[in-house]
Amino acid sequence: MRVLAVATPALGHLFPAVPLLWALRARGDEVLVVTGGDALRVAEAGLPVVDALPGETLTTLFGAYQETDPAFFVALRRSPMTTLRDLAPVLAYLAGRLLEPARRAAERWRPDAILATHGQAAGAVVAAEHGIPLVEHGFGFVRSDGAQEAVRQLLAERLGPAGSEPPPERYFLDIAVPSMTSAIEGMSLRAVPYNGGAVLPLSGASVGGRPPRPRVLVTAGTQLLHTHGAGALAWLPEVAAGHEAEFLLAAGGADLRDLGRLPPHVRVLDWTPLATVLPTCSAVVHHGGSGTTLAALAAGVPQLVSPALADNHINARAVADRGAGLETAVPDATTLTALLREPAFAKAAREVADELRSLPAPADVAARLHTAFGLPTTQGDA
């Protein structure tokens, strides 16, 4: 089977789908990814990728869209999104930019199925045009609320009726934790964290168990520090200075000069796979990104979430409502201490980790997709 993955050019949208794409490859299926910007890093996962948007990043794409619809982001800041449908206008813009490259890739490569990241309608249009199944892959706790249909309708205003036609078959893979959401959409899939790879020193923070002293991981994800600067972490020097914990700051190579001199027990890490560091930590403080949220849940680590953008507040609320962490506008020492000292948070986080391990693994879902498509289910027979 050949699977063409059409992905919104954002790590947070594409990286959650990497384990399923690996599972398909391990079965002997062929995979080709069409995306752009930072999401081209998926090539580091051993997956072939087509650069559909040469020279573009998510920041430049958002900037270009803002020029055409300046009121959209203003309205979004005033009234945060509640479902993915709220992002339909910008998702339609991104789909429009990806559509022709995705069409060309499909014409040349002739896939048997399309995998699209959540709300990425370019994949849906191509699946409909070729009469092949669409698999839409979720990336967190945000619910669809008809986002795919809304985005296709906006595309149809430019493409004509063909743009609104649905694929012949559609499957949705939901990586949200069942106990932390109102209802699972489609097929449940275990969230297996993928944050890239790294060469790790045996003596470093990423190998081994938790140290005797509490260790707190601090991260602002893949976008926030680069788009908003170190000001997103302005709280850190003061909180760390008066706290007993050791702090690991996963900065991803961002410019931190505006933070000034950091206390000696704050260690700055470059790009670091969170899944390798989190098991050594007693807590994580972050912005509410889906990838970080799910990685912490998989590791059973309590979270202090200060939501920043887009769906961040949805993830923060899911964590807080489950008792696996706390939500705060600005992290402070008192709240962090409460998170570390109250055992109920760690207990709830471990319960969620156990729940995640009970969900269908990517290999299981890959086999189910073969069955759904009427293809052989024995590994290697596809």
From Swiss-Prot:
Belongs to the glycosyltransferase 28 family. The keyword Glycosyltransferase applies. This is Elloramycin glycosyltransferase ElmGT. GO terms for molecular function: hexosyltransferase activity; UDP-glycosyltransferase activity. Changing L309M: Increased transfer of D-boivinose. Its EC number is 2.4.1.331. The keyword Glycosyltransferase applies. It holds the Pfam family EryCIII-like_C. The gene is elmGT. It catalyses: 8-demethyltetracenomycin C + dTDP-beta-L-rhamnose = 8-demethyl-8-alpha-L-rhamnosyl-tetracenomycin C + dTDP + H(+). Pathway: Antibiotic biosynthesis. One of its GO terms (biological process) is antibiotic biosynthetic process. Keywords: Antibiotic biosynthesis, Glycosyltransferase, Transferase. PANTHER family: STEROL 3-BETA-GLUCOSYLTRANSFERASE, STEROL 3-BETA-GLUCOSYLTRANSFERASE UGT80A2. InterPro entries: EryCIII-like_C (IPR010610), EryCIII-like_N (IPR048284), Glycosyltransferase_28 (IPR050426), UDP_glucos_trans (IPR002213). Glycosyltransferase that transfers an L-rhamnose moiety from dTDP-L-rhamnose to the elloramycin aglycone 8-demethyl-tetracenomycin C (8DMTC) in elloramycin biosynthesis, an antitumor polyketide. Possesses donor substrate flexibility: able to transfer at least 11 different sugars to 8DMTC, such as NDP-D-glucose, as well as NDP-L-digitoxose, including both L- and D-isomeric forms of some sugars.
